[in-house]
Swiss-Prot record:
It comes from Mus musculus. The modification N-acetylalanine is found at residue 2. A pair of annexin repeats may form one binding site for calcium and phospholipid. Keywords: Acetylation, Annexin, Calcium, Calcium/phospholipid-binding, Cytoplasm, Phosphoprotein, Repeat. It is found in: Cytoplasm; Melanosome. May associate with CD21. May regulate the release of Ca(2+) from intracellular stores. The modification N6-acetyllysine is found at residues 63, 68, 75, 81, 306, 370, 418, 483, 620. SMART domains: ANX. This is Annexin A6. The modification Phosphoserine is found at residues 13, 422, 537. Annexin repeats lie at residues 20-91, 92-163, 175-247, 251-322, 363-434, 435-506, 521-595, 599-670.
């Protein structure tokens, strides 16, 4: 079994088998493979129930008893993916890694993803064992083989990682952290070109503890996460390797949870990746991987394997998984503490919000007004000029252009634009030309017009706007539609959902910091209303009102503390419990508030992704988010989008829209990540 650090808790899913008898197991395997056909059920049941150390003893005893190589017999009797999985389980981990790397660099082409996964994630000790195992198994030098099969900075970083010399100090020098941040910044963002050697040296040698502090300081200093700089400064396999290293520094289990999800999502399964990870992590951190997988993807690893594989192969993988975490949102007690600590860190870090559209330099409203008039005069319309001007001016500058246009030509720019452009492009351009509060007011009005109500739009706007933005929306709504927003919401919605929306529409959310004592009380209210408290108290109607008050009026910093206390109190994530225990519009509203508090840019990244995935595009949502966030946090949304969906927002827009609408959206997007 894997060696456990003193005082550490074992987080693998496979344990030493009690009352283990290597002779008896060797005999059982021999019997299972004797005669015509083989008893695959017995083979998988036995091998997946033994630790790696015990399997090595079985191999030895099998050879002593029968004079045969157990692995060779298994290869002969089994086939396909099931054979690969069982044979990998029978090898010591270092030899399993060595075989994977040998396969990755043999023949035509190189499996760079396999090289990256193994070399970015292994500890110093595991790396030394890998090098020795490779030498023993193939009588070749691993470093020489990697140098012969790779090139450039990618090769250099692989060689650095292969040395297994990452620092292990728990004591971190603040001065060295600051120096490394400065060196990385100067090597990338501040340099014409990139000094890759600095990235290789720092990310390849510093301790994990040190690098986590470097990443935190880098974000504070530059306003962007280290991943964004890597994507901007590096490219190709080298970029992928460095991003994998950063992910493993931050959280190795999260890195593998992502790899497993990507191995099974979409059409087809990447079985080699699935096998490699399930085998290599089964005695290290599978419980942590399972927990992160469930929290991140809202489904258990067990259920995804069950739905994506079949036969004995599936049964063996499920045994390695070790259990189905079907209580969505519930943390293992140990993982709850990790989640609690993550909230502590997120409370400390302050991410600077940045839009993609800012005020144009050398702004000349007179010239812009004339250019727009020319673009719309005569036969045909010059859409390119309209897009270029409107998407590259701030909203305040656009209002000046509107005023100047009227002063010069005695015409309403909005009316002229309406008559010259149409469809999705018109919705986008006209939205950009409106003051933000009036634009939001119009979106709310449209959501309540006609038959049926667009609850999703009401929730999206009211759950995410600041107090100042909400108050401005109220004024704009009254001015434009001669009716208060509250009256409109009252007449168009009902019940608890109406109360939530009206509460949000008052714009009276507290704006102070956290109150720890109050946070504990609020967490208890949440636990009681969501029916997971040990000692529920008070009538349900009163609790519902208090819960609504907590989510709709407490400040964001305070609510983050409430969510943290909720985890501590219940071992559950509040978002998952709301999804499980509530329903309909009330559930959607509360989930939106929680997601906005946790990470508002990620909330909007999800909205954008869902507006473009699957058959057809939800152009209205796509337009609304791109218009409303372009000067606030669209750059942050872009970063969250690529981090979660493994493709850039730019790529998603390019693949899902077309023509002038696409050009205008890409201009707002502000660049490719």
């Amino acid at each position: 079994m894997a060696k456990i650090a003193q005082g550490a808790m074992y987080r693998g899913s496979v344990h030493d088998f009690p009352e283990f008898d290597a002779n008896q197991d060797a005999e059982a395997l021999y019997t299972a493979m004797k005669g015509f056909g083989s008893d695959k059920e017995s083979i998988l049941e036995l091998i997946t129930s033994r630790s790696n150390k015990q399997r090595q003893e079985i191999c030895q005893n099998y050879k002593s008893l029968y004079g045969k190589d157990l692995i060779e017999d298994l290869k002969y009797e089994l086939t396909g993916k099931f054979e690969r999985l069982i044979v990998n389980l029978m090898r010591p981990l270092a030899y399993c890694d060595a075989k994977e790397i040998k396969d990755a660099i043999s023949g035509v082409g190189t499996d760079e993803k396999c090289l990256i996964e193994i070399l970015a994630s292994r500890t110093n000790e595991q790396m030394h064992q890998l090098v020795a195992a490779y030498k023993d198994a193939y009588e070749r030098d691993l470093e020489s083989d990697i140098i012969g099969d790779t090139s450039g900075h990618f090769q250099k970083m692989l060689v650095v990682l292969l040395q297994g010399t990452r620092e292990n100090d728990d004591v971190v020098s603040e001065d060295l952290v600051q120096q490394d941040v400065q060196d990385l910044y100067e090597a990338g963002e501040l340099k014409w070109g990139t000094d890759e050697a600095q990235f290789i040296y720092i990310l390849g040698n510093r301790s994990k503890q040190h690098l986590r502090l470097v990443f935190d300081e880098y974000l504070k200093t530059t306003g962007k996460p280290i991943e964004a700089s890597i994507r901007g400064e590096l490219s190709g396999d080298f970029e992928k390797l460095m991003l994998a290293v950063v992910k493993c520094i931050r959280s190795t289990p999260e890195y593998f949870a992502e790899r497993l999800f990507k191995a099974m999502k979409g059409l087809g399964t990447r079985d080699n990746t699935l096998i490699r990870i399930m085998v290599s992590r089964s005695e290290l951190d599978m419980l942590d991987i399972r927990e992160i997988f469930r929290t991140k993807y809202e489904k258990s690893l067990y259920s995804m394997i069950k739905n994506d594989t079949s036969g004995e192969y599936k049964k063996a993988l499920l045994k390695l998984c070790g259990g189905d975490d079907d209580a969505a949102g519930q943390f293992f007690p140990e993982a709850a503490q990790v989640a609690y600590q993550m909230w502590e860190l997120s409370a400390v870090s302050r991410v600077e919000l940045k839009g993609t559209v800012c005020a144009a330099n050398d702004f000349n409203p007179d010239a812009d007004a004339k250019a727009l008039r020319k673009a719309m005069k005569g036969i045909g319309t010059d859409e390119a000029t309209i897009i270029d001007i409107v998407t590259h001016r701030s909203n305040a500058q656009r209002q000046q252009i509107r005023q100047t246009f009227k002063s010069h030509f005695g015409r309403d720019l909005m009316a002229d634009l309406k008559s010259e452009i149409s469809g999705d492009l018109a919705r986008l351009i006209l939205g950009l030309m409106m003051p933000p509060a009036h634009y939001d007011a119009k979106q709310l009005k449209k959501a309540m017009e006609g038959a049926g109500t667009d609850e999703k739009t009401l929730i999206e706007i009211l759950a995410t706007r600041t107090n100042a933005e909400i108050r401005a929306i109220n004024e704009a709504y009254k001015e434009d539609y001669h009716k208060s927003l509250e009256d409109a919401l009252s007449s168009d919605t009902s019940g608890h959902f109406r109360r939530i929306l009206i509460s949000l529409a008052t714009g009276n959310r507290e704006e102070g910091g956290e109150n720890r004592d109050q946070a504990q009380e609020d967490a208890q209210v949440a636990a009681e209303i969501l029916e997971i408290a040990d000692t529920p108290s008070g009538d349900k109607t009163s609790l519902e009102t208090r819960f609504m008050t907590v989510l709709c009026t407490r400040s964001y910093p305070h609510l983050r503390r409430v969510f943290q206390e909720f985890i501590k109190k219940t071992n559950y994530d509040i978002e998952h419990v709301i999804k499980k225990e509530m329903s309909g519009d009330v559930k959607d509203a509360f989930v939106a508030i929680v997601q906005s508090v946790k990470n508002k840019p990620l909330f909007f990244a999800d909205k954008l992704y869902k507006s473009m995935k699957g058959a057809g595009t939800d152009e209205k949502t796509l337009t609304r988010v791109m218009v409303s966030r372009s000067e606030i946090d669209l750059l942050n949304i872009r970063r969250e989008f690529i981090e979660k969906y493994d493709k850039s927002l730019h790529q998603a827009i390019e693949g899902d829209t077309s023509g002038d609408f696409m050009k205008a959206l890409l201009a707002l997007c502000g660049g490719e990540d």
